Swiss-Prot record:
One of its GO terms (cellular component) is plasma membrane. It is an enzyme of class 7 (translocase). This is Zinc import ATP-binding protein ZnuC. NCBIfam families: PRK09544.1 (NF007090). It comes from Pectobacterium atrosepticum (strain SCRI 1043 / ATCC BAA-672) (Erwinia carotovora subsp. atroseptica). It is a peripheral membrane protein. The lineage of its organism: Bacteria, Pseudomonadati, Pseudomonadota, Gammaproteobacteria, Enterobacterales. GO terms for biological process: response to zinc ion.
Amino acid sequence: MSTLVSLNNISVTFGSRKILSDISLTLQAGRILTLLGPNGAGKSTLVRVVLGLLAPTSGSLVRDPALRIGYVPQKLHLDTTLPLTVSRFMQLRPGVKKQDILPALKRVQAAHLLEQPMQKLSGGETQRVLLARALLNQPQLLVLDEPTQGVDVNGQMALYDLINQLRQEFHCGVLMVSHDLHLVMAKTDEVLCLNQHVCCSGTPEVVSLHPEFLAMFGHRGAEQLAIYRHHHNHRHDLQGRIILKRQGGNDA
């Protein structure tokens, strides 16, 4: 399995403030890594490092300069007074050929949105259009920054199903970022919990047979969603300092 991006003990400091400390991770073709963490954990900074938009203060990043990356941003801010159809929005990407737009939208089941105004789309529809735009360069790595933000549970299940299909079709690596600390995509190969440093990592615990989970999401939801249980040996105080836990759960 080929390695697309490798981060080795990277740290990022802005002035006297350390944003990321000693982060190591590997993104591989055909595998999904979900990055979890609360607001302010450094997730967006880490994404910028992976995308090559920010150089780490220390540590090393190994990435093929020709690596094709498809990026779906966390938020899309559009002027509500600006007439902009999905077709025109897709063409704003440099080098896009008009004949490639409809096939990309079809891949994400959004061909019917081609001439719809971007400002009128629902959260789930917007995410599908952004995914289609990210596919235009045949990516080897998909970076999805909170792709289910503003999308209801049914929409989340549909998006997760779609992301898995795209992973299989393109055999691309996927880095997915989320602030939901307990609900992640069941097809995730690895979960990495971040709070300035790597708090914990591992595979998600699939709870597809749990009666409460099935009652909430049904069998289809159980196939697409999973709960990840965190096992930390520490917590963070209000200043972000690490407080180690003793055995039995008390702080050291």
